[in-house]
């Protein structure tokens, strides 16, 4: 026999079980679930939604305006890049990985190339000029990525001016990228052993102009939002995630640093000579969306400082390793053919050196051979730790390449930052996570 009672304070119904009455217990449980079903609603936000930063699907269970459960649905942008890498040589792989996190392509390329170079044992042989240019491009890319995060986040919360300002400054940076690499995005400019080509003649002038105008432009963006009453009302205390939650979920990047922990791989595990640059690791202790916004704004100023140091350190020299078994036998200057082959090089391999022609053909078609082994390398992308686990079986193609994309890992924070808050606050919380679905789904 079972009896049900309701406490005097009007709390949940209590079912007391006396034995041999399982069907009554089940009936009471079903009745309770049915009563709650009328109050709770499951809502799909996305995958086609302007505020989900791509094809992200949020399954929200709501009770009134309060989110009681939040889950992510991913996979809508799966492209099979990691599998495709197993069917391309080590150099061709760069053209695939640059398309993953499409807002920070230089970080994808650098992480991949650092892994290949570590397997080859040539990490310390990379020309100084190539490393400095890598750092310069990554920091400009960090600024452009953060500008998109602030612009889209502002648009979603109604700050349209922030969107116009953010995309205006990003456009200036993309013009420089196009001048240097030939493409605004998906550059495939960083290659194992160095770079695809040296900087064009006017690149330094363009970058200098950029670092002159960016501080004032970024200050304009700060003036719009830092003390904006509506902006603070929508972000302060919203999307709260403390240090314990970040460590439990493996969260990195601005979200982790917004808890006060100064973890940045550029300082903790330097690569590309970052130990030679002076910059601060920006932290905040608010643990909320506003703190992450402040971190991204201040990080852009630090990136400008690093780019200025890169310009000062940039000395003439090669941009590709000198080992002819690894580097294409060309000077890699952009020639009239548009493919990076100078007339002098073409004349040499076509007319005066049959061995050079054969070697060039094998390097381009078959690719370099990488010793067997496995490595893990990581860089500090705009979203956190971007890691690459790379396995070689001694052939001309990777046996396996796996990316630890920070967007994928950080999406685990959706439930922790959204549950218990308002539906409208989920927009601000996801915007502060700044996921890029190209990196999540790969």
From Swiss-Prot:
Question: What's the protein called, per UniProt?
Answer: NADH-quinone oxidoreductase subunit D
Coiled-coil segments on the chain, per record: none
GO cellular component terms listed in the entry, alphabetical order: plasma membrane
Cellular compartment(s) = Cell membrane
Identify the Gene3D superfamilies for this entry: Cytochrome-c3 Hydrogenase, chain B (1.10.645.10)
Q: What role is this protein assigned?
A: NDH-1 shuttles electrons from NADH, via FMN and iron-sulfur (Fe-S) centers, to quinones in the respiratory chain. The immediate electron acceptor for the enzyme in this species is believed to be a menaquinone. Couples the redox reaction to proton translocation (for every two electrons transferred, four hydrogen ions are translocated across the cytoplasmic membrane), and thus conserves the redox energy in a proton gradient.
Assembly and binders:
NDH-1 is composed of 14 different subunits. Subunits NuoB, C, D, E, F, and G constitute the peripheral sector of the complex.
Q: Which GO terms describe its molecular function?
A: NAD binding; NADH:ubiquinone reductase (non-electrogenic) activity; quinone binding
According to its UniProt entry, this protein's organism is Mycolicibacterium smegmatis (strain ATCC 700084 / mc(2)155) (Mycobacterium smegmatis)
Q: What is its main location?
A: membrane
């Amino acid at each position: 026999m079972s009896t049900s009672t309701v406490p005097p304070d009007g709390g949940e119904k209590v079912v007391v079980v006396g034995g041999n009455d399982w069907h009554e217990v089940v009936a009471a449980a079903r009745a309770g679930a049915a009563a709650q079903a009328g109050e709770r609603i499951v809502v799909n936000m996305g995958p086609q939604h302007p505020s989900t930063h791509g094809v992200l699907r949020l399954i929200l269970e709501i009770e009134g305006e309060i989110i009681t459960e939040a889950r992510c649905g991913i996979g809508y942008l799966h492209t099979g890049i990691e599998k495709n890498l197993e069917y391309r040589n080590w150099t061709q792989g760069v053209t695939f990985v640059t398309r993953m996190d499409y807002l920070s392509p230089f970080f994808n390329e650098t992480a991949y190339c650092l892994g290949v170079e570590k397997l080859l044992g040539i990490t310390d042989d990379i020309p100084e000029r190539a490393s400095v240019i890598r750092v310069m491009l990554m920091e400009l890319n960090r600024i452009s990525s953060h500008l998109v995060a602030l612009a889209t986040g502002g648009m979603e919360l109604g700050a349209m001016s922030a969107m116009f300002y953010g995309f205006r400054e990003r456009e200036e940076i993309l013009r420089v990228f196009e001048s240097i690499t030939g493409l605004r995005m998906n550059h495939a400019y960083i290659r194992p052993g160095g770079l695809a080509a040296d900087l064009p003649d006017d690149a330094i002038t363009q970058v200098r102009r950029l670092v002159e105008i960016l501080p004032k432009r970024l200050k304009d963006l700060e003036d719009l939002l830092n003390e904006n009453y509506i902006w603070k009302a929508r972000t302060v205390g919203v999307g709260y995630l403390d240090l314990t939650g970040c460590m439990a979920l493996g969260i990195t990047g601005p979200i982790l640093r917004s808890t006060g922990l100064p973890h940045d791989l550029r300082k903790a595990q330097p690569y590309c000579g970052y130990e030679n640059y002076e910059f601060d690791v920006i932290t905040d202790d608010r643990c909320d969306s506003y703190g992450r916004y402040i971190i991204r704004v201040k990080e852009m100023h630090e990136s400008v400082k690093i780019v200025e140091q890169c310009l000062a350190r940039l000395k003439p020299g090669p941009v590709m390793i000198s080992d002819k078994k690894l580097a294409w036998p060309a000077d890699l200057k952009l020639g009239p053919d548009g493919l990076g082959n100078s007339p002098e090089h073409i004349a040499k391999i076509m007319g005066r050196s049959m061995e050079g022609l054969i070697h060039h053909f094998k390097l381009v078609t078959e690719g370099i051979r990488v010793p067997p082994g496995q490595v893990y390398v990581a860089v500090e992308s705009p979203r956190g730790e971007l890691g690459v686990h790379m396995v070689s079986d001694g052939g001309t193609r990777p046996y396996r390449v796996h990316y630890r994309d920070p967007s994928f890992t950080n999406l685990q924070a959706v439930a922790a930052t959204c549950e218990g808050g308002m539906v409208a606050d989920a927009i601000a919380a996801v915007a502060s996570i700044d996921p890029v679905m190209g990196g999540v789904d790969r």
